[in-house]
Amino acid sequence: MGKIIGIDLGTTNSCVAIMDGNKPRVLENAEGDRTTPSIIAYTQEGEVLVGQPAKRQAITNPKNTLFAIKRLIGRKFKDDEVQRDIKIMPYNIVNSDNGDAWIDVKKQKMAPPQISAEVLKKMKKTAEDYLGETIKEAVITVPAYFNDAQRQATKDAGRIAGLEVKRIINEPTAAALAYGLDKGKGNRTIAVYDLGGGTFDISIIEIDEVDKEKTFEVLATNGDTHLGGEDFDSRLINYLVTEFKKEQGIDLRNDPLSMQRLKESAEKAKIELSSAQQTDVNLPYITADSNGPKHLNIKVTRAKLESLVEDLILRSIEPLKVALKDAGLSVTDINDVILVGGQTRMPMVQSKVADFFGKEPRKDVNPDEAVAVGAAVQGGVLSGDVKDVLLLDVTPLSLGIETMGGIMTSLINKNTTIPTKHSQIFSTAEDNQSAVTIHVLQGERKRSSDNKSLGQFNLDGINPAPRGTAQIEVTFDIDSDGILHVSAKDKKTGKEQKITIKASSGLNEEEIKKMVNDAEANSEADQKFEELIQTRNQGDQLVHSIKKQLNENKNSIEEESKKDIQLALNKLENALKGEDKSDIEKNIQNLLKISSKLTEINQKKSEKDQKDNNMSANKKDENVVDAEFEEIKDPKK
């Protein structure tokens, strides 16, 4: 069995880790960084950039530079959270044919899983470059509070990237694995507070050790899948835009280029204010009017930032109370508090969490890497490389069906350990009913319409009978990824209908296959593009070198040879403007052949210069006179 890599597919940053022997190792990407910005750019030339290269060109290409895509994955266009994002994102979020939120890139509609797959491909390539082998399997993490549709969409992204997703695990659970693996003996109850770029989770986890086997059992989980660092950035951006409008009377919101520059600076200022009390946001030439260019220079203090985002931090405290209540624990039962996610570096976040739990959070867990490390550990468990670790995760939300009167009847309650299976008998609501519709729901509300609809199916062929007579057995089966399978069976006839809940919108099998094929085709195109760039660079270097030699040796070479070389140079320069790799290679060889005489002259000149330098050094040595000296001994006293 090959390596199963662990991937933290984050809203702001992503990270990949592997098990190296019995130790997890976070891998550096091609740019030498251990985390990769979850940013994807589609350039005018048709190139797809991921990570830092995408981030670097965001200012000049705001409409086609996509970030925080995880906030849209598995979501409907009409969702309130999506409608909020439409107002603040520089790129174009559109409604797809199935009602999902998609993105319009260069007049082409793209699904969030298809875009996220580009980040996963980079993570896969990072692992392949390090290991020197093809990677086909991965464990990918998701926020604990992700619903079924969001989990399915994440699995789809993995497939499009060419990965078989062996397991989807919750981010706080992964962080607990990273924390608990090398800790000493004894049982501990920990709280994992995970505030990332776009999502917030809290999980209460019990780590037990029996006969050298560690069991990580999730007791309860809660959260908010639309609360994170991006919201903190938005508050600061809005403040800066408002201040600038007060000073200059210009609203920067109408200028995507200015907003992209402002986003970058706001993120930087927020990070700086975690260690400094004050910072300057200084953006010269941010815009212009009839009076000339305008510059933005605003001082931001830590206190000001805290006043802008305090309500967001307080929003994260309520789920802590619910999670503790669901686990049947109080704050005094918590041994350790672990902080995960880049936003937890903010001092105010740390102090509010410390105030709630009555203890300082642990500082020995890397908030950016812990989740990927935990995913790698789970990958090791699945491949058999890691022994004596058992992970018991939970389903974050209750699952049930709609029953008479539009009520949701739960079959599996939230925080039930998975995998799990539960059956319940239901009956018909009307006389002589020959079919029932099973409407599957996820959520905590009593009214069906207030919960998320996961899908519905019909069970036909029920024998006509008075209402309440037929017996329909409905079974809910949740697998280790937290994905639901539902069956309904007529006890009398034995007739059964089964479905794996696919998000009622989501990508269908045909769409996923098409995206997988597109990704494979693009991979080939990307390889060809990379080879073209390398050949082009080789050609550029040769042109520069020959021009330099031609200039230095213009008096030593015959006029005819000079003309031939110049002609070959012109041909290569023209070829470099095109996209034909073989044409560039042909002209490189041609120039090398024709300029061989010039290279020979240049080499002889270099040898002569070297010889002259040596002779000059020897002459200097001949003129040196050795000093004479006489040793004088001290007279004896």
From Swiss-Prot:
| Renumbered residue ranges of the record's region Disordered | 599-637
Domain of life here? Answer: Bacteria
- A Gene Ontology molecular function term of the record: ATP-dependent protein folding chaperone
Per its record, what triggers expression of this gene product? By stress conditions e.g. heat shock.
Q: Which InterPro entries match?
A: ATPase_NBD, Chaperone_DnaK, Heat_shock_70_CS, HSP70_C_sf, HSP70_peptide-bd_sf, Hsp_70_fam
Residues with the Phosphothreonine modification? 199
Q: Where is the composition biased (Basic and acidic residues)?
A: 602-623
| NCBIfam families attached to this UniProt entry | PRK00290.1, PRK05183.1, prok_dnaK
In the record, the note on similarity to other proteins reads: Belongs to the heat shock protein 70 family.
List the protein's name: Chaperone protein DnaK
Identify the species of origin.
Answer: Buchnera aphidicola subsp. Acyrthosiphon pisum (strain APS) (Acyrthosiphon pisum symbiotic bacterium)
